[in-house]
Amino acid sequence: MANNNKNNLRVGIDIGTSKVVCIIAENTSEGINVLGLGIQNSIGLRDGVIVDIESTVAAVKEAVSKAELMSGKQVTKAFVGIS
């Protein structure tokens, strides 16, 4: 996951055919601590190909927003996968 800032935050976004998932986590001395998770239905992909960019962007924004709300952190960069 992308290193988001000095707090060792990591952010990953998975854009899939059925859903978009955003996870916000941090590295600690004990391991990885998940701070927030956002899941949103995806309707802009078909067979791993983006067919409706506006719907895909909206789903990503919503998943990120949910993860930010849960974690209390703001996402500035992330690793993104499309499947």
Question: What does each model-identified segment do?
Answer:
Residues 13-19, 82-83:
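A short acidic Gly-Thr/Ser loop motif
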Residues 45, 72-83:
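Short beta-strand-loop/turn "lid" adjacent to the catalytic site in phosphate-handling enzymes
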Residues 16, 71-72:
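Short, solvent-exposed loop/edge-beta patches enriched in aromatic
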Residues 1-7:
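Entry/capping segment at the start of metal-dependent catalytic domains
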Residues 8-14, 77-79:
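Short glycine-aspartate micro-motif
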Residues 57-68:
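Short, well-ordered amphipathic alpha-helical segments that serve as non-catalytic structural scaffolds
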Residues 18-51:
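Short glycine-rich, Thr/Ser-proximal phosphate-binding strand/loop in the N-terminal lobe
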Residues 52, 56:
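Phosphate/oxyanion-binding active-site loops and adjacent basic polyanion-contact surfaces
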